[in-house]
UniProtKB/Swiss-Prot annotation:
Gene3D superfamilies documented for this protein: QueA-like
Gene for this chain: queA
Pfam families in the cross-refs: Queuosine_synth
GO molecular function: S-adenosylmethionine:tRNA ribosyltransferase-isomerase activity
Originating species: Rhizobium etli (strain ATCC 51251 / DSM 11541 / JCM 21823 / NBRC 15573 / CFN 42)
Entry's EC annotation: 2.4.99.17
SUPFAM superfamilies referenced in this protein's UniProt entry, alphabetically: QueA-like
Domain of life (superkingdom): Bacteria
HAMAP family associated with the record: QueA
Protein name: S-adenosylmethionine:tRNA ribosyltransferase-isomerase
Family stated for the protein in its record: Belongs to the QueA family.
Cross-referenced NCBIfam families: PRK00147.1 (NF001140), queA (TIGR00113)
Amino acid sequence: MRVDLFDFDLPDERIALRPAEPRDSARLLVVDPDAESALSDHHVCDLPSFLRAGDALVFNDTKVIPAQLEGIRHRDGAGGQQVSATLHMRIGPSRWKAFAKPGKRIKEGDRIAFGHSGESCMIGSLDATVEEKGEAGEVTLAFDLSGPVLDEAIAAVGHIPLPPYIAAKRPEDERDRADYQTIYAREEGAVAAPTAGLHFTPALFEALDKAGIERHFVTLHVGAGTFLPVKADDTDDHKMHLESGYVSGEIAAGLNAVKARGGRIVCVGTTSLRLIESAAGESGEIKPWAGATGIFITPGYRFKAVDMLMTNFHLPRSTLFMLVSAFSGFETMHAAYKHAISTGYRFYSYGDASLLFRKDK
């Protein structure tokens, strides 16, 4: 499909710079393409009323790390140059894939000293060698530190990598360290938050428990590639970024049991959906799964396991708007976004949410 078919105009003032307080007071647009009235306006705290006892919410429990690093590049003894790197996928105890700026001036073999003005952190120098250079500013960094010691060093000098549409308007601050993290995050490794999960509060969890809604947790480490623009003119020519994660045998069995009892699988966020669909066979059975997924979902895709999706409002021309268009219908989602814009919904990571029913007709 032509990528420009997924374009729409979004006024700048619709981009949320801070989350709603409390989190579950955010607005919730319910989209049911097969209902007589496809769109209805609610709040996230109303979520239990749209679910049934025996349904299962699937959350992504990845935890955002301070993956934005600033440093000084050194080459052949020459003077240093300021560079930045956003880590996006760990490929070994001491090696990370990253997006570096300015990418054109970085070469294989360069040494980069990360930290404030290239200084050492308390547990040692956070230095790395550019091991490999790829496309679009992507590099492979081999750090001198390894394992938990490397993790500690990154935590000491790194910054939360706010999405570019927020970072362009204000700097990251201490509040973001809490705001840009779900309350159930536990598996470190994400560069971006699974933002649909940001709306959940202890009070909402309690209400869901009382309604008999199950909670299941999977892990997909969201990478910086989620913010990369689609540069191709046709979806067939777009290469999807890879993200690593896993579905345990216990979770797979639990979700299959939910389906067998007639319950629905409700994914909280596109990351949970992409992971569950990667783990599902053609019959819809979910199997234990671990690895890197590059699943790219566009209209025409047949969903195998997921029945409902809770997700925020996405960028024009993005792979995520393509995904929701595949899930609830191309025309329905264009109408939903037009409604959201005209009625003041807040967009993107800190914005409001939508609850989507899968289009079956």
